[in-house]
């Protein structure tokens, strides 16, 4: 399976997602701050990123834009508890693969992780 980056300021969400996705065979790295996430994205190759929309030091959309400067083909799932139609549209226009509201169904998230990686591999075969 692939390597994932998860960024969320809620440490319980980070722990649960890391544990569940690792049990599915993924390698998972986590960050709770934007600068740490940017650093990880600069030194690692990920197959997908899961980013919280609202972070204490910024937002997931701006983080996604920064990550896409390093890896334009990286699929990004945006998660949020504070979602609006406007923020969903903004995220998708900025390059998000999908936008999910918290609380989310883990099965849906897992499906979107698998699907996002497959779609990215089809669009950018050099990512394989």
Regions found by a protein language model. Name each.
Residues 44-50, 55, 77:
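Active-site beta3 strand of CheY-like receiver
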Residues 30-48:
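Acidic, metal-coordinating helix/loop segments flanking the phosphotransfer/catalytic sites
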Residues 11-29, 43:
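Two-component/phosphorelay signaling modules centered on CheY-like receiver
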Residues 39, 61-73, 90:
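Short amphipathic alpha-helix used as the core "switch/output" element in two-component signaling
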Residues 14, 56, 84:
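The feature encodes the CheY-like receiver
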Residues 8, 52, 80:
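Active-site residues of response regulator receiver
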Residues 33, 59-62:
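Acidic catalytic/metal-coordinating carboxylates
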């Amino acid at each position: 399976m692939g390597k994932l980056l998860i960024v969320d300021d809620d440490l319980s969400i980070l722990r649960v997602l890391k544990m569940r996705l690792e049990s599915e065979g993924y390698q998972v790295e986590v960050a709770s701050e934007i600068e740490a996430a940017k650093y990880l994205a600069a030194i690692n190759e990920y197959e997908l990123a899961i980013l919280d929309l609202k972070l204490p030091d910024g937002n997931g959309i701006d983080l996604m834009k920064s990550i896409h400067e390093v890896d334009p083909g990286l699929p990004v799932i945006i998660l949020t508890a504070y979602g609006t139609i406007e923020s969903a549209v903004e995220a998708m226009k900025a390059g998000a693969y999908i936008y999910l509201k918290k609380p989310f169904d883990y099965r849906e998230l897992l499906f979107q992780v698998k699907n996002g990686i497959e779609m990215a591999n089809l669009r950018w075969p050099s990512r394989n």
